[in-house]
Structure formats: structure tokens, C-alpha cells
């Protein structure tokens, strides 16, 4: 189990539920998105929902730091472009895809498990990689809100983005989670 091998990279005891995956993709409204970047696809649960909902004309790629997850995501989603790379490299891969900025970044990163400096660096990279009006969507696990990293992340996105909304809680996810929908 990857949680025990790499707890900071994995961040959850189980893959994200189909219900929470559907919620993040529905909230993103991908039908009008030009360039979608997925960070930390894990086993590819979001990826499947994204691939089923993006227009053929949209550019899509994902960045995953865990090599085993990269292979699993590719296996489960053969049409997806998945790179074994850090989320710190968004701009590098945007350039590789002939894009300057993204209009939608979807994240499965375990923000509530990351050290403050890593959170800050990654959030800066996300923000700088989004065009004006671009959307950043990320899951948050309910128990993360009681711990300092989760509270710090919530404060950081509210300070950085002009609009931050929270979706309903998906209680059937293990552990329960919701989506932060942030607009630059």
C-alpha cells in the first residue's frame, strides 16, 4: 500500500470515491476549458472523470510524483497524458504542450499533509500557471481542517485567490471530503 510506503505523497487511506471525483469535475465545468492540468492523479480516479468530460479540442496533461501511480493511471486511462514529474514543474509542461497558462488546474495533492514551505511553493506555482479568471479545484479531507497544515492551506487560498468556494461534503468518501473551487 502506497500510504505506508510514501505517506506524504499519497496522503489518503483509500482512492478518492467516484462521488467526490464526479463532484470536482462537475464543479470545474470542463466543457468550456481550453487547457486542463491535473496534479497528483494518484491511481487515476479523477483522470477517468476528466477524460470522460473534456472536449476533444482541450489540452490535458497530469503530473504525478509517484512512479507506481503514474503507471497505474496510464493503465487505467490510456488516452491520458501522464508525466512522472513534480507539481512544481507545471510551467515546464505547459511549455511542452505549447501553452502559456492553464484555465483549469485540478488537484488531488494532499495539501493537508504538506510542510508549509512545500505548500507555499506549490500554491505559488499553481497560481502563476493560471490565466486571469482561471480556476483551481482541489479536494480537501474533512479531518484535515482540524490540523495546522489544513487550516494554513485554507487561509493561503483565501488570501491568494479572488474567490474561494467550498462544495458540499461527500460523506461517503473515506475519509469524508469536499472541493475547494478557487478563481484567480
Language model regions located:
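Conserved beta-strand signature within the Rossmann-like core of class I S-adenosyl-L-methionine
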Residues: 132-140
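A short glycine-rich, Lys/Arg-flanked "PGG" loop and its adjoining helix->strand segment in the class I
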Residues: 120-132
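Class I SAM-dependent methyltransferase Rossmann-like catalytic core
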Residues: 1-31
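Glycine-rich SAM-binding Motif I of class I
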Residues: 44-48
Amino acid at each position: 500500500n502506497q500510504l505506508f510506503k510514501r505517506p506524504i505523497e499519497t496522503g489518503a487511506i483509500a482512492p478518492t470515491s467516484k462521488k467526490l471525483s464526479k463532484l470536482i469535475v462537475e464543479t470545474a465545468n470542463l466543457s468550456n476549458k481550453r487547457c486542463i492540468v491535473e496534479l497528483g492523479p494518484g491511481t487515476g480516479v479523477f483522470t477517468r472523470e476528466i477524460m470522460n468530460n473534456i472536449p476533444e479540442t482541450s489540452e490535458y496533461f497530469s503530473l504525478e510524483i509517484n512512479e507506481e501511480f503514474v503507471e497505474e493511471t496510464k493503465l487505467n486511462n490510456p488516452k491520458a497524458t501522464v508525466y512522472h514529474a513534480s507539481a512544481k514543474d507545471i510551467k515546464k509542461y505547459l511549455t511542452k504542450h505549447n501553452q502559456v497558462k492553464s484555465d483549469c488546474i485540478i488537484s488531488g495533492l494532499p495539501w493537508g499533509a504538506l510542510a508549509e514551505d512545500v505548500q507555499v511553493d506549490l500554491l505559488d506555482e499553481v497560481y502563476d500557471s493560471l490565466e486571469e479568471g482561471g480556476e483551481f479545484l482541489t479536494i480537501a479531507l474533512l479531518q484535515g481542517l482540524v490540523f495546522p497544515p489544513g487550516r494554513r492551506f485554507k487561509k493561503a487560498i483565501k488570501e491568494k485567490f479572488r474567490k474561494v468556494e467550498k462544495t458540499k461534503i461527500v460523506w461517503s468518501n473515506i475519509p469524508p471530503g469536499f472541493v475547494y473551487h478557487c478563481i484567480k
